[in-house]
């Protein structure tokens, strides 16, 4: 067994789904396989390209997470893991399942939005995504 992890933007309430990237959810599967989840976090977190760069086709989604509170959240996470979280941190992983979640105190939290397909579109436009591959390589 092991803990399952997903990249999450706590500010915008968005996440990346590693399964859509043909990789597992465990830390070792993401950290030592294809680096694809890390590539997506980089694409979302860089400062917007509108000031130049030119190494990728411009897309307004690039840099969408710049300056936001972005973390990898695990299914064993508890509130004490991140006391300055804008929401009870222990609920963050549950909010990546596409459904609203009611915590133990009866408070309902709105589900996070999956932005994986939006970032895959950027990667396809820049030759970084092979739909037929068993695993993806970031570069």
Residue spans of the language-model regions?
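Low-complexity intrinsically disordered segments
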Residues: 30-139
């Amino acid at each position: 067994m092991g803990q399952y992890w997903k990249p999450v933007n706590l500010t915008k309430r968005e996440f990346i789904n590693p399964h859509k990237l043909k990789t597992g959810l465990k830390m070792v599967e993401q950290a030592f396989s294809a680096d694809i989840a890390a590539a997506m976090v980089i694409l979302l977190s860089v400062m917007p390209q509108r000031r130049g760069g030119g190494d990728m086709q411009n897309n307004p989604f690039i840099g969408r997470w710049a300056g936001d509170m972005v973390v990898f959240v695990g299914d064993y996470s508890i509130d004490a893991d991140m006391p300055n979280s804008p929401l009870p941190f222990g609920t963050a992983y549950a909010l990546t399942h596409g459904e609203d979640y009611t915590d133990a105190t009866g408070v309902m939290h709105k589900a996070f939005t999956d932005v994986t397909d939006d970032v895959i579109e950027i990667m396809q436009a820049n030759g970084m995504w092979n739909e037929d591959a068993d695993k993806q390589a970031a570069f």
